[in-house]
Amino acid sequence: MTRQPRVAVVGAGLAGLTAGLELARRGWRVDLYERSRLLGGKATSFEVDGHEVDCGQHVVLACCTATLELIDELGLRDSLYVQPRFEVTVLSRKRPPARLRASSLPAPLHLMAGFARYPHLTTLDRIRVGRALVAARTDVAPKGDMAAWLRRHHQSARALRAFWDPFLVPALNAPLDRVSAAMGLFVIRTAFLGDRDAARIAYLKVPLARLAEAAAARLDAVHLRQAVVGVHREGDRITGVKLSGGAGAACDACVIAVPPQRLNAMLDDAPALGVTGLDAFEAMPIVDVHLWYDRPVLGCDFAALLDSPVQWVFEKAPGYVCCSLSAADDLVQRPERELVELGRSELASVLPQAARARLLRGAATRDPDATFIPAPGVRRPGPDTALSNLVIAGAWTDTGWPATIESAVRSGRSAALTLFRNAASWPASESTRAGLAREVARAV
């Protein structure tokens, strides 16, 4: 009988869970290790005053095909809201609510009708934004940061605050002067220029923890509150993982799906294993403010805010809203009461119904290391290492996407596929090697 490999997956975020699923689907035995008590990593849920809340408001777009496939695989498609067509309500202190919506025309013409009626841009702004979108389609090797690219294409301060910032800053979780133009243009091309429906917004209507729980249920063993602090190595192979407290666990292969700083600490000599540049990654916080009112306050499912530290707000249930504050390095250290008051006052300033409603309770969630900053010159590693049975995964690795759920899922799949390809050359009995070779052929 062929013995399938036992693989240790370190990190129960979506990258690790996806890698584990890919391996388990082909018969590999998967041990999942997570140092916290929760599954899902940055896409998880927990209780606040008896309410299960997500650690942050995560959305995907229709172009996030790997994430949508994962949701389908785990049987959660019925719990997913997907816009029939891209449309966003935009709130401002200076004007009544406006809508930016796509038409039925093919991309990129589908945005033109929406721009023509968008009151936060002047006619000249609309023309220049349109020209910048055309330039984004053809500029395949941009230099410098995204803010500089926008300046070179004559984008006004008004266009920045009314269009570019509300969409790009949350997607990249960083100010545009700290983001590479290449990554900014990737977001523009993928969401707005490739397909008319690509920018449709989608999100789960159930707590995010359901996604992670459904994935973990398909693995052989899940070890929560079990930190992996290193790996055992014999020659050119990983033979096990080192656990906190001095214990160890044997494995035939290992997927490490943790942030770059933890990976650097976990590997004795990351550069010697072919994993370089980990010290160059900088993290950016995200803050979410959860507010419970005595009545519904938003009047729509979600909206973008202009000229506000609250970039987006979602009404997740009648009277319960989640305010998302991206690139929140100047807010993450504030006390919870200040963050709750900030969210309340910002909503009251643009929503008369929120100003009249009574706030029942509030809470803030903070992730000081939410995502890496995709700065110019940052080199993201792929899944391979110098050891054929050790791969890495994470939204920060080289998926081509910013640090999003989509990037995490894609990285997990890539790491698993890399192991499949490598496995055919591992020392094993002839029957095992033949079986692995067949698995590799099916995976590819």
Regions found by a protein language model. Give the residues of each.
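Glycine-rich FAD pyrophosphate-binding loop
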Residues: A24-V48
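Conserved FAD-binding subdomain of flavin-dependent enzymes
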Residues: K42-S45, G50-V82
